[in-house]
Amino acid sequence: MKKILILGTALLCGFLCRVAAQGVEFRDLTFGQALEQARTENKLVFMDCYTSWCGPCKNMLKNVFTLPEAGEFMNAHFVCVKYDMEKGEGIGLKKQFAVRAFPTFFIIRPDGTVQHRLAGGSQWERFRERVARGLEETTSYAYLNERYQQGKLARKQYPHYVQALKDAGDRPAVKNVCMEVFGQLSDKAKCSAENWYIFDQEMGPADPRFEYLSLIHI
């Protein structure tokens, strides 16, 4: 009996190791089935929106999502699916989620609402950081954007909100929020280290922030 238990444990460990080693498991599910599976497994849905001609999309699928460490992390937290935005169900999903660039990735709750949005690919280490922000409710795009729209976003949360907007690829919103904060801060506060993020985002020579920096001596 003891030998059987040991053998069973060894086989299970071997199976789990192989699952992790295979990289991210993209399941062959419809979007509705993915949401249902996420409810069953108490996970979120990770959706990869790609096209057949997109070079960065191919790079993510071939060189990033195939990594064992990517599989270990992603498979533990998500029901992962991918859809070609120009074929089948992907055509409707592209419109539903307003996908404008490729690749775009979504972290979606089991009720179908978006928790976080990621525009563009990257190397695994950086991509993991971006995904991790979306996993954490208080640093996710949905949470921070809702707080902002309600006028309840605390000053210390603004850097996280700007980062979430960057993750989503919303460059106009990044600039608008940084300009908003810039206009509200005193000169002393603008020079404070925790507020320097407003000068690091979407700033050109004609920007008031650029003019401000040119007039001060640091």
Language-model features, listed with the residues they occupy:
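Short active-site neighborhood of thiol/selenol oxidoreductases, capturing the structured segment around
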Residues: 41-52
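N-terminal leader/targeting and pre-domain segments
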Residues: 22-41
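Thiol-based oxidoreductase modules, predominantly thioredoxin-like and allied folds used
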Residues: 25-29, 67-89
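Non-catalytic, surface beta->alpha helical segment in thiol-disulfide oxidoreductase systems
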Residues: 100-140
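Bacterial Sec-dependent N-terminal signal peptides
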Residues: 1-25
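Oxidative protein folding and maturation machinery
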Residues: 148-216
